[in-house]
Swiss-Prot record:
Coiled-coil annotated spans: none
Pfam families: Ribosomal_S8
Superkingdom of origin organism: Archaea
Role of this protein: One of the primary rRNA binding proteins, it binds directly to 16S rRNA central domain where it helps coordinate assembly of the platform of the 30S subunit.
Similarity-based family: Belongs to the universal ribosomal protein uS8 family.
SUPFAM superfamilies named among the record's database cross-references: Ribosomal protein S8
Gene Ontology cellular component annotations, sorted alphabetically: ribonucleoprotein complex; ribosome
Name by which UniProt lists this protein: Small ribosomal subunit protein uS8
GO biological process, one term: translation
Organism: Picrophilus torridus (strain ATCC 700027 / DSM 9790 / JCM 10055 / NBRC 100828 / KAW 2/3)
HAMAP family: Ribosomal_uS8_A
Length: 129
C-alpha cells in the first residue's frame, strides 16, 4: 500500500474542523501541500498557515476557519479537459458555485474556477466545500 501525504493532510484538516479545533499541525511539509493550503486560504477555507522549520522536512501550522463542511482527496488522480470539469464538479460538490475542486495544471495548482477562466485542464487532486 502506498502512502499518500495529501490524503493525510486533508483528513487531518477535516477531522480537526469537525471536532472544533482552531489550529492543527500537519507534517511533513512539502511544496505541493503548501500550494494546496494557499488555494484553500484564497477561498477562505482556512484562515492562515505557516511553515514550522524542523530538522527533517518541517511542518505546517494551519489556523482553521469554520467554513469547511467536507473535504476529500480525489483518487485516482483523474486527468480532465477544461470542457469536462463541470462533470466532476457535479460529482464531487453538492451544488454549483458551492465549494472548489483543487487541480494541478501546467500553470500550477489552482481551483477549478481559475482553471476554467484560463481555459485549461489538469489532474484532479481534492475537493473542499
Amino acid at each position: 500500500m502506498n502512502h499518500d501525504p495529501l490524503n493525510d493532510v486533508i483528513n487531518t484538516i477535516k477531522n480537526a474542523s469537525r471536532i472544533g479545533k482552531s489550529e492543527v499541525i500537519i507534517g511533513p511539509a512539502s511544496v505541493m501541500i503548501g500550494r494546496i493550503l494557499k488555494v484553500m486560504q484564497d477561498y477562505n477555507y482556512i484562515k492562515s498557515f505557516e511553515v514550522i522549520e524542523e530538522e527533517r522536512g518541517g511542518k505546517f501550522r494551519v489556523e482553521l476557519s469554520d467554513t469547511i463542511n467536507n473535504c476529500g482527496v480525489i483518487k485516482p488522480r483523474l486527468s480532465v479537459k477544461n470542457s469536462n470539469i463541470e462533470r466532476y464538479e457535479s460529482r464531487y460538490l453538492p451544488a454549483q458555485d458551492f465549494g472548489i475542486i483543487i487541480l494541478t495544471t501546467t500553470k500550477g495548482i489552482m481551483s477549478h474556477i481559475e482553471a476554467r477562466k484560463l481555459g485549461i485542464g489538469g489532474k484532479l487532486l481534492a475537493y473542499v466545500y
